Regions:
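Short, highly charged C-terminal tails/helix-capping segments
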Residues: 111-132
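Active-site beta-strand/loop architecture of penicillin-binding DD-peptidases
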Residues: 1-17, 21-111
Length: 132
């Protein structure tokens, strides 16, 4: 980023060589995950969010992951959230990713999302016996 503008290379389309059918299939599955799966917490009124959770096993607490993009048919933002020792993907990854997308797309958080953000600012994660 220079002078508040993204490098033009980020606007260039890249082609993977994968048949479009598989892309559409994956997007539909990611949308369903937000509507009725593990990503339900990423639902943002008026925005079609697509996402996928992940959980990485760890000796201690599992790591929480979420990847998503929005809006579905004309993406403006893609996020990847990875919270060490955050538990399942829907524990930290999904809600934090949803807050980031809502703020970016709408330019602000709704009252309920602002309240959720406030809760997350005060949550602590235990790292190997140390709370951070």
């Amino acid at each position: 980023m220079q002078d508040g503008r993204l490098d033009p290379k980020y606007f260039r389309r890249n082609f993977t060589g994968v048949d479009r059918h598989w892309y559409d299939y994956s997007v539909a599955g990611m949308r369903r995950a937000v509507l009725s799966g593990t990503c339900r917490g990423a639902n943002i009124p008026g925005i079609e969010v697509c996402g996928k959770t992940g959980t990485a096993q760890n000796r201690g607490q599992d790591h929480s992951a979420f990847m998503g993009f929005a809006p579905m048919n004309n993406p403006k933002i893609a996020v990847a959230v990875y919270v060490e020792n955050g538990g399942f993907g829907d524990a930290y990854g999904v809600p934090l990713g949803a807050l980031i997308m809502e703020q970016f797309i709408n330019g602000r958080l709704s009252a309920s999302s602002a309240a959720k953000a406030n809760v997350f600012q005060h949550r602590r994660i235990n790292y190997g016996g140390y709370e951070r």
